[in-house]
Amino acid sequence: MEGERDMSRTKVHVIPHTHWDREWYFTTSRSKVYLVKHVKEVLDALENGDGFKYYLLDAQGSLLDDYTRWCPEDEERIRRLVSDKRLMIGPWYTQTDQLVISGESMVRNLYYGMETAQKYGHAMKVGYVPDAFGQSAQMPQIYQEFGIRHFLFWRGVADNTNPKTEFLWKGSDGSQVFAVQMPFGYYYGGNIPEEAGELEAYLDSQIGALEEKASTRHVYFPNGFDQAPIRLNLPELIRTFNELDPEREYVMNEPERFLEEIEKDSNDLPVLEGELMEAKHMRIHKSIFSTRADLKQQNNEIEHLIVNTLEPVLSISHALGHEYPHYIVKDIWKLLFENAAHDSIGGCNSDTTNRDVAFRYKQARDIAENVLELHKRLIASKIKQEETFAFTIFNTLPYPRKGVTEIDAYLPEGSFVIRDTNGQQLLYTITEKVEQTDYVLGQHIDLNPSKKVYLPERVFRAKLLVELQEVPAMGYTQIIFDFSATGDTTAERSNGKHIENEFYSIAVQENGALSITDKISGRVYSDQMVFEENGDDGDSYNYSPPERDLTVSSLGTDVETITSKSTVSEELSLRMKLKVPYDLNERSAAGTSAELPLQASVSLRKGERLIRFSVDVDNRVLSHRLRVLFDTGIASKLSIADQPFGVIARPTTLEEVKVWEREQWTEKPITIEAMQSYVALNDGSRGVAVMTEGVREYEVIGHEHDTIALTLFRTFGYMGKENLLYRPGRASGEKIVETPDAQLLGELTFTFALHVHESGFDEAGIAQAAKEYLTPLSSYQLSDFLNGRLIFAFRDEERIFEQNYSLLSFSKDSNVILSAFKKAEHSDGYIVRVFNPYLEKNATAHITYSESAHYELVSLDERSKGETLVSSDTEGAQLPELQHCKLLTVLVTPELN
């Protein structure tokens, strides 16, 4: 009977922990200085033998890297405690966001986080997410790929969806993990009173609330808070808990052991599917996706640079005999991880902290661009050719590509033609040309004075658009600039209002918007590219409209137009000035004393089905939001957008809007959503997609929910504010922290694209079009007159590489999307990661490596799944068929000669 009573008692698992924001309203420097004090106290407490058994260091491996960099003498102490599973770290490197950073960034964060934790002795196999603002629908699959079966979190689930704390979470692909919610947050047990009378009432209240939500006898009671010191007398307090409350059992524990216990006692759990984004009981800040648009844009650009260009080029370079710079790439990623932490990428920081974020982006970009340039140069310098003006063109997608691409070049004065390696003349136009003779030639160094080097009399830095015929899959080709022949590069400029290519005809309407005609179907889309400006009374966490708003539309605004037309592209430039309120006070009075100058460039490239947009804004006003609207004419109940490693359909209206105020939700449920690169509306026979290089935020608006609103930017003046229309009650963050930098005053530039199609979504190839849009062909100019201090001098190399090269390719009928191609972390092979981008149909691919190779399925942590596709073959390997939102990773290992 005694045993039965024990088994019926509530078992309270007291989890000592910290939630350590590496930066927020304070800087990383302050955080790291105080981290040293904190970790020393934790190590001492765990070692003193007074019942302090476990401590959770926020599941962030970066914290120990930070600590041991300054306290290397404690590394062995840490290894001992981590190996004994008493100091719990991992699986993350930093506590990352899951909605606005890329899928690859999340995967690398987990990979390097677990690698770091294992370096110290043990990586916690729990998806521990105490504070991220919502949970991506693809995380169950990602967790399972890393061998993580348990998920412990706070934000995103409300009692109207699941009244209990335990459930099974099913991801978009069908993967499941066992989930436990901390219903009242990670800080719930952070303030324990020590006076006996107060403590007894406290336990009855706090633990009683947890019991009401628990579906087993186990409850999770976290003792910790933001950057709070360890509660040194916690073992003594737990002994007191047991004395004061004999009806319950109190034990100190850590997440892994807790989850193993509670899972054994769990039966018939409900299954929750998809994103966890409910804000009834806790805030998820669902419009933080556009906070500090300037920083979000930098993050996106660098993620694309690393994954879409840098890692593939480094892999090509490695296959050609050059060393793969693993540690440089890791350092770039770790800079991004610091910025991927939920507050950092959220932008909900002080201005000082956000300047640190911006500097890390600068560092990451500088390193990435320079290591990319070095390896393109290593390859180009060994290609068999003797031309003065040879350009190597790199294709980092697994199929041949052609079309118009932009190239940067240093050119002498004079006319020229461009030819490919077959001697075929290529069409081109020069779009920009600036003389830099003194700068370039003044840096030249003659390493070999005996060698005759052509030095032009004048040098111009130029941008060109060149129509390439074919660039090999995952490889390179060359094009030659021939100055002995004459080419016509002129573009005709006029005050016209119309441009076109094979697919579209675009004209400026009388009201200043665009009329787009799809030449294939003859369908006309009127009132496109409408700019909408309105007030933002929110803060760094949430967009919120003012109580008295004024919305300004570009419709009816005077527009000046210029067209530029060449053989390879046509461009339409529009200038306008919106009359807008200067600030929220003027907006509430419906005043419009300020101007918001806009310049929009709309371009069509020969043979391309994309309409490209670039918008320059001179932001002179405060606390507002600017969006660009595309009226699709497709009444939609669902929007379609990409998510990490797949696609997701979301409702365009929410029933919860009717009850949120009555039920006192912490935030208004809204349909402002996140994407990775595109959003689309489709009625089964036609569709429209908007692709972005910048802010990954959209909303579907209009009476028929037929208009895609792409957020360009939003601005605000305080880190936190109280009593917002969309977020009533207390301020998030700190309301006294002013953020004038977040007003984003000055010049801003945004780029995005439009894709119109007469087909269902799956048939339109939107994911591939977006991937190509975000993966431009890359070029390198090898010219002796550039060899010098300008780019660091290079010696002459033996020319042994062919002018055309392909390392790896997918067959023509392959329909997966390449997510990553890189050197494996700890083997001689290459990682190929793909996913199914479709709503309904399955996807597959046939991969062929350039040599005989071994093809093996591996998990996201690059461990073998025990399934070899092909052991040794020159014909490649057929991948298994992938269902909706499934990802697949293949290790391709070349045979040693």
Question: Where are the regions that the model predicts?
Answer:
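Terminal accessory/anchoring regions of large secretory-pathway or extracellular enzymes
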Residues: 3-6, 10-12, 43, 47, ...
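N-terminal catalytic cores of secreted or lumenal carbohydrate-active enzymes
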Residues: 3-108, 116-118, 145-149, 168, ...
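C-terminal domain-boundary segment and adjacent tail
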Residues: 16, 55-66, 144, 155-158, ...
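Terminal accessory/targeting
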Residues: 1-49, 189-244, 248-254, 259
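CE4/NodB-like, metal-dependent polysaccharide N-deacetylase domain
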Residues: 107-138, 145, 205-220
